[in-house]
Amino acid sequence: MQTQRLRIAIQKKGRLSQECQELLKKCGVKFNIMGERLVVHSLNMPIDLLLVRDDDIPGLIMDGVVDLGFVGENVLEETRLDRLALNQRNEFTTLRRMDFGGCRLSIAIEKDAEYRGPQDLNGKRIATTYPQLLKAYMDRQGVDFSTCMLTGSVEVAPRAGLADAIADLVSTGATLEANGLKEVEVIFESKATLIQRPGAFAADKAALIDKLLTRMHGVQQAKESKYIMLHAPVEKLAQIKTLLPGAEDPTVLPLSADKSKVAVHMVSSENLFWETMEQLKALGASSILVLPIEKMME
């Protein structure tokens, strides 16, 4: 089923949903999400947002129901493996890995348990919401185990006597710590990713996708970059430039009153830390300003 409007699936609720919405707004897509609506129409572009459960998004893409989808790589790979096992459609194209939504799927055991490696999990029962990712990892390790399938509160399984270990998503590790568990193996590293359905697109829809990708790249580049302005002694300019990794060569302008210094303007492709600013100061730089960049196009 195809329409003239670009259909983008995003998670209905949660932090990933908020970050995807913020990214689209920074890309110039205007919309108002109100109430429990499933479909939200953009106010200024031929784009519809579908607000759905995160684990529904890969299937909607693979079945060609929607054009694009933002989803965590952990959910995407779990769905792909599940559909592969069931001989169902599992094709998609990854367009861009995002710089948000980071987490990892890890195996954790009770804090006081001895652990020497994956072979210690032989014959154990492991609780998880990601059975396919867990099985793929254990098969690579040659470990025989059984799965306890849970859809929530996986971390309480060992304490409740349901399992010997768990395989669950970890961000900071605070939840594991609170439940007397320790992380012992990382199964899968994940971030949010933008995926596209299989098949060709009409020219206008393909052009709109390219426009969005260009803007997303600009938003991410702006987030990772800073605009730097400073006054630098002419004789120290070469040394100062080595401290400032830039997207391009800096703009160097003469000062009206002080001929021994120049004004340097540049976009730095890396974060400028206090230590770097102190090094610049030590080389005679002054009036150092570091500014955020809202949008950027190379």
Swiss-Prot record:
Mechanisms controlling activity: Feedback inhibited by histidine.
GO cellular component, one term: cytoplasm
The protein's enzyme class: transferase
Cellular localisation: Cytoplasm
Pathway(s): Amino-acid biosynthesis; L-histidine biosynthesis; L-histidine from 5-phospho-alpha-D-ribose 1-diphosphate: step 1/9
Catalytic activity line of the entry: 1-(5-phospho-beta-D-ribosyl)-ATP + diphosphate = 5-phospho-alpha-D-ribose 1-diphosphate + ATP
Main location, first listed in the record: cytoplasm
Assigned protein family: Belongs to the ATP phosphoribosyltransferase family. Long subfamily.
Function: Catalyzes the condensation of ATP and 5-phosphoribose 1-diphosphate to form N'-(5'-phosphoribosyl)-ATP (PR-ATP). Has a crucial role in the pathway because the rate of histidine biosynthesis seems to be controlled primarily by regulation of HisG enzymatic activity.
Protein name: ATP phosphoribosyltransferase
Organism for this UniProt entry: Vibrio cholerae serotype O1 (strain ATCC 39315 / El Tor Inaba N16961)
Taxonomic lineage: Bacteria, Pseudomonadati, Pseudomonadota, Gammaproteobacteria, Vibrionales
